[in-house]
């Protein structure tokens, strides 16, 4: 067996997805629009050339629009920071050479910024597949470890098809030489 077949690494995207960039940008632009409209009504001048604020009084419309603009900016800053920090991003590494499994994720800054979990391959009991149907279907792969809880391996985002989840579970179970549960 060559070294390529001894190590498998699955990259987890985290918050650096196209949809997060899209929503952070849309919220930012909308918030700027609301804030400039509110400030324009306060000063009585058009701060942006395409705004006509003569019919908007500062109290209550301009004040409320300024408030919404500030809240939108705060939400936009939060979204951009999660993208910059890559919250939820990381990898799952299965290393037969070292006999170890390593699950790594980035979190928010602080004491638990890096979540780095390691287990021995001998501790793995099974790969579990969980299907939840409904309005928001979830298809998740779990690593079941002896005496411990189930550790999610799937990334959050667009749900995979049932076939893709089954294929991933079968490949990983074959590589780790354990059984698949939940199919």
UniProtKB/Swiss-Prot annotation:
It holds the Pfam family Ycf4. GO terms for biological process: photosynthesis. The chain crosses the membrane at residues 23-43, 64-84. Belongs to the Ycf4 family. Coiled coil: none annotated. NCBIfam families: PRK02542.1 (NF002712). InterPro entries: PSI_Ycf4_assembly (IPR003359). Seems to be required for the assembly of the photosystem I complex. Keywords: Chloroplast, Membrane, Photosynthesis, Plastid, Thylakoid, Transmembrane, Transmembrane helix. The keyword Signal does not apply. It comes from Stigeoclonium helveticum (Green alga). It comes from the Eukaryota. One of its GO terms (cellular component) is photosystem I. It is a multi-pass membrane protein. This is Photosystem I assembly protein Ycf4. The keyword Membrane applies. PANTHER family: PHOTOSYSTEM I ASSEMBLY PROTEIN YCF4 (PTHR33288:SF4), PTHR33288. It is found in: Plastid, Chloroplast thylakoid membrane.
């Amino acid at each position: 067996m060559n070294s390529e077949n001894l190590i498998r690494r699955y990259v987890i995207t985290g918050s650096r997805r196209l949809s997060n960039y899209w929503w952070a940008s849309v919220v930012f632009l909308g918030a700027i629009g609301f804030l400039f409209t509110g400030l324009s009504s306060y000063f009585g001048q058009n701060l942006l050339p395409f705004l006509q604020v003569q019919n908007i009084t500062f109290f209550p419309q301009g004040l409320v629009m300024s408030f919404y603009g500030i809240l939108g900016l705060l939400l936009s800053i939060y979204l951009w920071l999660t993208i910059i920090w890559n919250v939820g991003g990381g990898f799952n590494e299965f290393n037969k050479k070292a006999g170890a499994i390593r699950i790594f994720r980035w979190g928010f800054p602080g004491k638990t910024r890096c979540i780095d979990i390691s287990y021995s391959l001998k501790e793995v009991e099974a790969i579990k597949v969980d299907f939840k149907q409904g309005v928001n279907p979830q298809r998740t792969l779990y690593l079941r470890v002896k005496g411990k809880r189930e550790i999610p391996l799937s990334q959050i985002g667009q749900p995979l098809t049932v076939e893709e989840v089954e294929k991933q579970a079968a490949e990983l179970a074959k590589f780790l030489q354990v059984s698949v549960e939940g199919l």
